[in-house]
């Protein structure tokens, strides 16, 4: 679903494994009997993940062997909404579910690596930190980061090479976090 062709396509086996190891962490959005979006998650032990990691590391190269039911972080590994159904607040509803799940499971926070897909437009002028600050100040619109900031997430760290093929983000991602305050 990304314009740069870096779509992540999930195999039936991967989805089945995620459902088997953590069914409540996998959700779909259905409109008129059609799946139009999904959110996939695992639980990780933050002490093992740390601030600097890649998508491949946190997902065990998409084997999900990093899932730890006794961990303390709900880690989002994917969210997508079919382009024809964007703007209907469906992603926001999935994030509300994740927040409720985090609270129910008494986890410390929700975290994930968030792309900054409009950064390529500014990369020759400003560094990622400045870009993030300008998005926070609403001087720059970034479809991913703007949404996450409006959904109570904060940037914990800028990570390099999180998604090595993400040219739009210039190989950067924001480690985003929403704390469970309950």
Regions found by a protein language model. Name each.
Residues 24, 170-175:
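Short hydrophobic/aromatic beta-strand or adjacent loop that forms the aromatic wall/cage
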Residues 81, 87-103, 109-112:
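Conserved acetyl-CoA-binding loop-helix of GNAT-fold acetyltransferases
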Residues 2-48, 53, 57-65:
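Active-site rim helix/loop that mediates acceptor-substrate recognition in acyltransferases
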Residues 178-180:
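Long, compositionally biased interface segments
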Residues 39-78, 96, 116-143, 149, ...:
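Conserved acyl-donor/pantetheine-binding loop and adjacent beta-alpha core of acyl/acetyltransferases
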Residues 16, 99, 144-145:
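Short amphipathic alpha-helical segments and helix-helix/interface helices
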């Amino acid at each position: 679903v990304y314009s740069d062709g870096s779509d992540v396509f999930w195999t039936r086996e991967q989805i089945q494994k995620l459902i088997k190891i953590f069914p409540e962490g996998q959700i779909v959005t259905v409109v008129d009997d059609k799946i139009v979006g999904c959110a996939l998650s695992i639980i990780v032990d933050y002490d093992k993940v740390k601030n600097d990691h890649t998508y491949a590391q946190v997902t065990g190269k998409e084997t999900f062997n990093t899932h730890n039911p006794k961990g303390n972080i709900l880690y989002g590994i994917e969210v997508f909404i079919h382009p024809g159904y964007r703007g209907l607040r469906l992603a926001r509803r999935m994030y509300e579910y994740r927040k409720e799940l985090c609270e129910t499971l008494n986890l410390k926070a929700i975290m994930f690596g968030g792309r900054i897909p409009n950064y390529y437009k500014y990369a020759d002028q400003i560094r990622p930190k400045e870009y993030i600050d300008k998005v926070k100040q609403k001087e720059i619109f970034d479809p991913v980061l703007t949404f996450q900031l409006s959904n109570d997430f904060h940037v914990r760290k800028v990570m390099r090479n999180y998604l090595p093929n993400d040219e739009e983000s210039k190989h950067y991602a924001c480690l985003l976090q929403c704390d469970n305050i309950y």
